[in-house]
Amino acid sequence: MWAGVAGLRGSCAGLQALWGGHRAALLLGRSPALHTSVASCGSKNLLKKFASKTRKKFWYEGPSLGSHLTPRPSKHEFLTKTTSKKTRKEDSIRLRVLNGLLYKSLTELLCTPQVSQEVYDLNVELSKVSVTSDFSACRVYWKTGVSAEQNKHTESVLQRSAAYMRHLLISQQTLRNVPPIVFVQDKRDLVLAEVDRLLAEADFGPPDERDDLDGLRNADAQVPHDSPEPAAHPNLCGIDHEALNKQIMEYKRKKERGLQCQSLAPPSGREQAPEPTRLLRKREKVRSRWQHRDASPRSFLLGEEDEDEDSSTEWECHAHEAEDDDDHQEEELGADRGAQRGLCGKREQG
């Protein structure tokens, strides 16, 4: 009890001291400021900090802190970019099966006008379907053409129809949950065609040079038909080709003349036939000369064959004429003998 009374007295004494000090300050400096203790203000600030729910603000904002100022990729870029997350073996098998199912279903949709007549008229051919490992996107690769404008138009039409195609796949119960479909150009065929073009250019040169070579070849091929042949030089390497050609043609004519004389054997009327032994000797001489004579163009050009040619042709002509005369004489003798036998028979009967 006495302790409580002593405490009250102490507090009253403190209040009086404070009031006295305040009055003294007003009298001396007439300042309206109040002097308070530092301990009481510090405790209030700490309580406010603990009671408030505001977080600490960062002065430097960056992508690691999730700032709203950093640029975010679009939805299309997010769906088309490759994922770096590694897949397990069982997940890869499951994804392979899903890719096959989606490829089959999407191919059937594109082959029918069920999606739209515009998509059906494009006649798009798919190369493969790839579902991401986190099942966030379904990338459908389609084969591009040569024209860049046509490829751009096809891509825009397919992207517009992607949501409706996803709705059709879900309604057909191909999968319970089909990820968003994104159509991606498969440029593998274009890359292969570019590689073939570069290899052909490395082997045969650029197209301009190849066209020039083709034009030169065609010009060479058309020269014999369009323009007359240039006249050959008469003397080449010291040889008169014109005279040589004449000699060759003369040699050919003589050969043909000899063959014609051998084949022709017309009857020359009744003439005195040579003796048989003489004819046989002439034939043997002709045969031996034809067998052993040199019938090459070289001997003809050197003039070694002219005499043999003339003599052999004459002997052969005489031999054929003699043979024809012998045959004709034998026929006449046979006719005369038949006539004589007929006369003898008539005389005997008379």
Swiss-Prot record:
Basic and acidic residues bias: start-end ranges: 334-350
Pfam families: RBFA
Biased composition (Acidic residues): 303-313, 322-333
Signal peptide span: none
Transit peptide: 1-41
Subcellular compartments: Mitochondrion
Record region (Disordered): 203-237, 255-350
Biased composition (Basic residues): 279-290
Record-given protein name: Putative ribosome-binding factor A, mitochondrial
Alphabetized SUPFAM superfamilies for the sequence: Ribosome-binding factor A, RbfA
Stated family: Belongs to the RbfA family.
Primary location class: mitochondrion
GO CC entries: mitochondrion
InterPro entries cross-referenced by the UniProt entry: KH_dom-like_a/b, RbfA, RbfA_dom_sf, RBFA_mitochondrial, Ribosome-bd_factorA_CS
GO biological process, one term: rRNA processing
Residue stretches spanning the membrane: none
Keywords: Mitochondrion, rRNA processing, Transit peptide
